[in-house]
């Protein structure tokens, strides 16, 4: 259970400002405190799967852009930044842990293409992990993020082929009855085949 008074005391001890407890709608707009550059935060979130950071980034982006609720902000993002996704996107929070968030591999590949055109390749390889957790693969050609929930595994990112092409990919494996290591091994085989064939 969260102890709000303890959190308030810790914040008062740390922040050089007045700390007031309350819901956003009770407190008004407030003041955003400028924090560190976003790249180190994104890198931490991508490498350690920090779902709390993901949620906080979404909340802050919502506030900076002037949206009252997360629902209206997500609707805006779906109709603007992600309007070109090929499949319907069900997006209810930023944590990535909600059973209500639903996406497809095709959508993730399209989102990766959008990212590819928004930032440099050097930024991509800085943000995306270049390792599988089992470290059985030569990692220098795959930059990808894993996602794992019970009986669900995902791997989405970029692959550099032998010819130097950069491809976006996404695997989503669910409801499997074999050990997760077998899923990872088969994914690795497919990625190696694509790397070598193209």
Label each region the model flagged:
Residues 1-122:
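A small/polar active-site loop signature that marks catalytic segments
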């Amino acid at each position: 259970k969260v102890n709000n008074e303890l959190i308030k005391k810790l914040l008062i001890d740390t922040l050089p400002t007045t700390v007031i407890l309350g819901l956003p709608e009770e407190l008004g707009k407030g003041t955003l405190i400028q924090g560190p550059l976003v790249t180190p935060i994104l890198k931490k979130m991508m490498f350690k799967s920090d779902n709390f950071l993901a949620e906080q980034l979404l909340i802050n982006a919502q506030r900076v852009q002037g949206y009252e609720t997360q629902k209206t902000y997500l609707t805006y993002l779906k109709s603007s930044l992600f309007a070109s996704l090929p499949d319907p996107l069900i997006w209810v929070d930023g944590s990535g842990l909600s059973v209500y968030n639903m996406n497809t591999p095709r959508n993730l590949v399209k989102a990766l293409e959008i990212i590819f055109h928004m930032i440099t390749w050097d930024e991509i390889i800085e943000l995306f992990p270049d390792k599988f957790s089992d470290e059985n693969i030569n990692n220098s050609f795959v930059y990808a993020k894993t996602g794992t929930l019970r009986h669900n595994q995902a791997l989405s990112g970029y692959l550099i082929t032998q010819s130097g092409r950069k491809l976006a990919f996404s695997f989503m494996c669910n409801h499997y009855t074999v050990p997760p290591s077998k899923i990872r091994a088969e994914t690795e085989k497919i990625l190696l085949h694509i790397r070598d064939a193209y």
